[in-house]
Amino acid sequence: MVKICCIGAGYVGGPTMAVIALKCPAIEVVVVDISKPRIDAWNSEQLPIYEPGLDEVVKECRGRNLFFSTDVEKHVAEADIIFVSVNTPTKTRGLGAGKAADLTYWESAARMIADVSKSDKIVVEKSTVPVKTAEAIEKILTHNSKGINYQILSNPEFLAEGTAIDDLFKPDRVLIGGRETAEGRKAVQALKSVYAHWVPEDRIITTNLWSAELSKLAANAFLAQRISSVNAISALCEATGANVTEVAYAVGKDSRIGPKFLNASVGFGGSCFQKDILNLVYICECNGLPEVANYWKQVIKINDYQKSRFVNRVVSSMFNTVSGKKIAVLGFAFKKDTGDTRETPAIDVCHGLLGDKAQISIYDPQVTEDQIQRDLAMGKFDWDHPMHLQPTSPTAFKQVSVVWDAYEATKNAHGLCILTEWDEFKTLDYQKIYDNMQKPAFVFDGRNVVDPEKLREIGFIVYSIGKPLDAWLKDMPAVA
């Protein structure tokens, strides 16, 4: 029986291994992690991450051919194929700080694999890593090999949170990069045969190692670039009276462009986009390509501009001050159908409002109060380090309350900011919300969730990203 072990029980490792176990009942799959609370959660009824469909997959396989364990060395030693899905955070100090990927956890995993292995292994990069990481890992394993043969493969994930299980069931493509040697091709074929249990052969792409590593960074950079492009146009729409939804629809009808990732918003978030672009920028700089690096930097600059522009709009609309005013924030996750708050635009928006001394009341259906307070208290890149290295008792913001529903959040509020596109926010009783808010009552829709005209009929003053401005807002000071 083939045995697969995955090091890292996070957003990628857990769901990916669960689906492999479901689709390959003859393969034993073990997910290992040094975090006992995380493994305990995977073995409980309350999984550590929220993802539609994940519960059902885990419950069907767990205890049959899917296992979660803290006995890392035992299962690594026994495995034929080892997936490494550990954090690759952005460095916070030293060479490349603020841009380069920190491969500390990857290197530790590689050294541990070399220490405990007693048979040949296929080691698979699942984490997003810089180009040429496989070469570095290969050197560590080879120099500590004790006669054992290691083949390194790159198999980047292309999952979107909120649809991860569907993405795993029906992927656009599965990318496998390996060495162009007889042993390398054999290793690629071994991993290909795992995915072939449910993925059509024409969707399994094989490349060399470096192409696979760069493809992941490039894919995320291209997606983020589309979001920043439409967000840049949204600012121009507001200035000219155009409607970004209409513009995006017209542009997306061009078959060369297509409609996906053309929704204007308060900005992109998530664990990958900004981190991977910064990594790409650093790689370009290291390879003497400053013009290319500067091109990709602009994607992040527009994203930061969009968030600060949103905060400025809130403050300037409300008589140029939100000091002491209650502002309701609906949605804290970086997008709907996930509880993930990593790099969520809500953090920067809340910080901007808190900087102007607002009182903030937050509601998100999937994010806990502890997580929200932790996110608001943490430094820029702290979120991407293991839990035991994060602040254990973050200082709670006295101006922030986290509540159990949207109606409680908006009660007596002066303004309402929609920062995540949860479906439930489309069907709220906005008349009830309006009746319980201070007047004038403002709605700042950072996700274009609501119908601005219907809300204006109720009495709200409405700002929607990239839409023609409310008459009230036209008379307010210009937003920088």
From Swiss-Prot:
Q: Which domain of life is it from?
A: Eukaryota
Q: Which GO terms describe its cellular component?
A: nucleus
Its UniProt pathway annotation is:
Nucleotide-sugar biosynthesis; UDP-alpha-D-glucuronate biosynthesis; UDP-alpha-D-glucuronate from UDP-alpha-D-glucose: step 1/1
**Sites of the modification Phosphoserine?**
393
* Annotated positions binding substrate: 157-161, 216-223, 256-269, 334-335, 447
Q: Where is the active site?
A: 272 (nucleophile)
Keyword field: NAD, Oxidoreductase, Phosphoprotein
- Report the GO molecular function annotations: NAD binding; UDP-glucose 6-dehydrogenase activity
Name any one Pfam family assigned in the record. UDPG_MGDP_dh
What residues does NAD(+) bind to? Answer: 8-13, 33, 38, 86-90, 127-128, 161, 272-275, 342
BP GO terms, sorted: glycosaminoglycan biosynthetic process; UDP-glucuronate biosynthetic process
What chemistry does it catalyse, as a reaction equation? UDP-alpha-D-glucose + 2 NAD(+) + H2O = UDP-alpha-D-glucuronate + 2 NADH + 3 H(+)
Known EC number(s)?
1.1.1.22
Database matches in Gene3D superfamilies: Cytochrome c1, transmembrane anchor, C-terminal (1.20.5.100), NAD(P)-binding Rossmann-like Domain (3.40.50.720)
> Which InterPro entries does its entry note?
6-PGluconate_DH-like_C_sf (IPR008927), NAD(P)-bd_dom_sf (IPR036291), UDP-Glc/GDP-Man (IPR017476), UDP-Glc/GDP-Man_DH_C (IPR014027), UDP-Glc/GDP-Man_DH_C_sf (IPR036220), UDP-Glc/GDP-Man_DH_dimer (IPR014026), UDP-Glc/GDP-Man_DH_N (IPR001732), UDPglc_DH_euk (IPR028356)
- Function recorded in the entry: Involved in the biosynthesis of UDP-glucuronic acid (UDP-GlcA), providing nucleotide sugars for cell-wall polymers.
Its family remark reads: Belongs to the UDP-glucose/GDP-mannose dehydrogenase family.
Protein's name according to its UniProt entry? UDP-glucose 6-dehydrogenase 3
Species this protein is from = Oryza sativa subsp. japonica (Rice)
